[in-house]
């Protein structure tokens, strides 16, 4: 690799390094990006690079010719090759997402500061944390999910501080036109509309990351998730909410 552990600022953000120092977590060889020469050698076999993972040292590619995978398996630095994805049917592919209309009907609960979230807040004792001054200020949270449908257009969510978004499933997709699950998860934490809905961390900053492909169930989603969690670490997030689970 062209990177060096003596220069971690070349592959980790200043915020990530500050968090590591604060938590006494050293930078080690697993933090080094996947060797660029290896990635390029794989690309030259006629495949498209989808994601890479430095912690488990993998490269995920896409191609429609199994002979290319056979050639890749013979490269001296490749330990093994595994099929992790299959093209979904046309029916599933055509499910793709259109922005539907938004009903911006704000429902106030004038007797409750937390609005619709009061039960969850009371159950988790988050109101006590808020009273003590812990409202998420200064913290960065990554939400790894299947999509954040219309979170950028819902008026009640406009004061959630989103610092960035990234799609690991398909970089050409609109992360705000995908599944609504992540939007709902985000609202439980980031909403900050008194008497409508106040979440558990209304003053935090948020990264929105998509790793779940709701149109198919394939092992590649574990690769997407690994790439997303590595990215979250590299930009220095403090916490990750990932309402997803996989098994081998």
Q: Where on the chain are the PLM-derived regions?
A:
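Subtilisin-like serine protease catalytic core
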Residues: 80, 117, 127-221, 235-238
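Soluble non-cytosolic domains of exported or imported proteins
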Residues: 28-33, 62-69, 119-123, 138, ...
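Solvent-exposed, polar/charged alpha-helical surfaces in well-ordered, non-transmembrane soluble domains
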Residues: 36, 40, 67-70, 127, ...
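Protease zymogen maturation seam
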Residues: 74-139, 150-156
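Short acidic, glycine-rich surface-loop motifs adjacent to enzyme active sites
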Residues: 229-248
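Structural motif
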Residues: 51, 70-73, 133-134, 199, ...
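Short, ordered loop/turn segments at secondary-structure junctions
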Residues: 86, 211, 245
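Inhibitory N-terminal propeptides of secreted protease zymogens
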Residues: 1-102, 214
